[in-house]
Each structure stands twice: as C-alpha cells, then as structure tokens.
C-alpha cells in the first residue's frame, strides 16, 4: 500500500471554511455561527473517505511571536482581529480532530507552515507521498517529487493538486525555490510582507525570468535602468527582508514518527458525545467512515508543554509532544 501523509494547515482551512459559508451561515437554534466547524469537518471527512490517507496530522498556529515578528515588527500587523465566532470554533474543531484520533501539533515560535514544511520533507525522505492541505500559495516553495500542495474543493471548484510542474507553470519560474524570490519582489499583502514598492506579480516574474534570483536582480539594477532600476535600488533592503520573511523553515524541532501519525479507527463514542450536542453536524457522518487502518488499535494523544532554552532569538519555546496514553 502506498504510504500517504496528509498534513492540514488548520487555521488556513478554518478561515476558508468560515468565510466560504458567510452568505449562507450555519447557525444554531441560539443563533451561533458554526461555519468553521461545519466546513472544516466536511473537509476532514472528505479527505479521509476520498483520498484514503494512511497517515495524517493537523498543524495549528499559536499566539506566540515567531522569528519573523522579531525580524519585522509589522509582520501580519495589517490583519483584522478574527471574528469571535471563528475563534470560538477552534476548541470544537480540536475536539473533533481528537475524536478522529488524528494528532494536532502546534509549536510556539513557529507557524503551521514551518511545522508542515519540516514534517513534509522528513516524511518524503522516508518514502512517503505527502500532501500539504492548504489554500496558501507560500507552500509552493516546498513541493518536490513526493511533496504536493492539496487545495480542497471550494465553492463549487474541484480539488487541485500542485507539484513542481504546476507551481512553476503558475509563477512562470524555472524552479520552485524561486517562489520565495517572487514573493520577495512583489510582497504578500496577506502577511504584510512589503516586497519592493511598485513591483507587482507580472514584473516580478519578468525579472526572475531574466535574472533567476532577487540577489541577481539587485546586482543588475544599473543594467535594468530607468524607473524600475531606481525602484529596485531603493527597495533592495526590503526585497532581501521580504524573501527572508517568505521563506518557510524546514528544520523545526519536530520529528516524523510514523506510528504517531497513522490513521486509526475513529473514537465513535467521543465523536457522538461531542456531535450529539451540536446541531451543526450529523453524527451519522462518523459511522459512514471506513478508516484505512481499521484493525490498528485506537490511540489517544496527550499534549505536553515543555519549556526549552531560547531558540532563534526567541525567549520562550514550547514544544507539543505527542505521546500515547
């Protein structure tokens, strides 16, 4: 059997679910908006039933600052506060994930992107085919022979699977490593990454087609000349900073132990207890699931927080250890 690991970017999928149903919200009898719970759970079940993963995990962001915030204080500073309904959904969603016996991983000082990137490359090196489940374009820098982006269906669209070929075609680049150069030049409004003012996506792709990297673009600013050459000179520091901010870390202190990520039979009692009290989902969804490793023993996971020495300029770093109970 092919070993397939699916790594879910929790917050990206939760936001997507919440706003994807915003015009037709899933409300409880008390008027509570449960778009996020409904949408995320639907995506999770569809993945398990349709894609037949052998291994799975869900990565969450934390509220702790990261090295990116230390490097650039305005990193993600343009984001509005999340709606209260969305924030209230997170504990529900974590309980659902736990009911499926799927590990949740979060690590202070790092974003979910970094955790997923690290685990994806480790698992690929161990012979797994890895799917990073996210709508975020940043993940394009991580794809390789056995590592793909998996964009779930959204508002009527079909799922989209992107490998190196698809990522390079999308950005008109020669190698996926150039994704961070694209983002460094054009910036990323979602994360408040500045890029070079006046350089958009088309210009960034044109510059990289000729010069291959941000460093070479900056080195040839005089040759480029004109107003664009002046913009490049003026924005040189911003470009280098932006490339650094856009780079996903792949040496996070987490380890892929395949036995901890196995798909196991769901905990029907736990799901029933949780879902019977929630009008936004039908417990029959759980009974229709046919887990890949149905004969494996069920597992429970404890979340243990450990204080560790300073890491990458951070004063505090908490590591979530998955341990069978």
Protein language model annotation of sequence segments:
Residues 261, 266-325:
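Long, highly charged low-complexity segments
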Residues 55, 109-111, 135, 312-314, ...:
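Conserved DEDDh/DEDDy metal-dependent 3′-5′ exonuclease domain
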Residues 12-16, 138, 325:
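Short acidic, Gly/Ser-rich segments with clustered Asp/Glu that frequently serve as metal-coordination loops
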Residues 12, 62-67, 83-92:
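Short, compositionally biased "basic patch" segments
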Residues 2-3, 23-27, 77-256, 278:
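Extended two-metal-dependent nuclease catalytic cores across DNA- and RNA-processing enzymes
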Residues 1-57, 61, 67-72:
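Non-catalytic, usually N-terminal nucleic-acid engagement modules in DNA/RNA processing proteins
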Residues 24-33, 97-107, 297-303, 307-311:
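Short, basic, glycine/proline-bearing loop/turn elements
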């Amino acid at each position: 059997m092919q070993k397939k690991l699916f790594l879910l970017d929790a917050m990206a999928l939760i936001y997507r679910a919440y706003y994807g149903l915003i015009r037709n919200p899933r409300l409880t009898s008390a008027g509570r908006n449960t778009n996020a719970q409904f949408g995320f759970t639907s995506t999770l079940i569809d993945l398990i039933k349709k894609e037949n993963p052998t291994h799975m995990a869900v990565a969450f962001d934390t509220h702790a600052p990261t090295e990116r915030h230390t490097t650039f204080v305005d990193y993600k500073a343009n984001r509005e506060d999340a709606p209260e309904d969305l924030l209230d959904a997170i504990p529900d969603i974590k309980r659902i994930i736990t009911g499926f016996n799927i590990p949740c991983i979060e690590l202070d000082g790092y974003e979910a992107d970094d955790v997923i990137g690290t685990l994806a490359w480790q698992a690929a090196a161990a012979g797994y085919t890895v799917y990073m489940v996210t709508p975020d374009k940043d993940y394009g820098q991580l794809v390789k022979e056995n590592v793909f982006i998996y964009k779930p269906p959204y508002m009527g669209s079909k799922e989209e699977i992107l490998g190196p070929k698809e990522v390079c075609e999308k950005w008109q680049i020669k190698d996926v490593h150039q994704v961070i150069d694209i983002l460094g030049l054009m910036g990323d409004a979602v994360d408040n990454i500045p890029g070079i003012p006046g350089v958009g996506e088309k210009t960034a792709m044109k510059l990289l087609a000729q010069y291959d990297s941000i460093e070479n673009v900056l080195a040839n600013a005089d040759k480029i000349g004109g107003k664009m050459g002046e913009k490049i000179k003026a924005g040189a520091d911003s470009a280098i900073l932006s490339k650094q901010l856009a780079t996903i870390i792949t040496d996070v202190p987490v380890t892929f132990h395949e036995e901890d990520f196995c798909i196991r039979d769901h905990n029907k009692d736990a799901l029933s207890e949780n879902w019977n009290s929630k009008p936004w989902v039908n417990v029959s969804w759980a009974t229709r699931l046919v887990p890949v490793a149905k004969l494996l023993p069920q597992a429970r996971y404890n979340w243990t927080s450990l204080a560790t020495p300073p890491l990458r300029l951070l004063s505090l770093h908490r590591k979530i250890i998955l341990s069978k109970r």
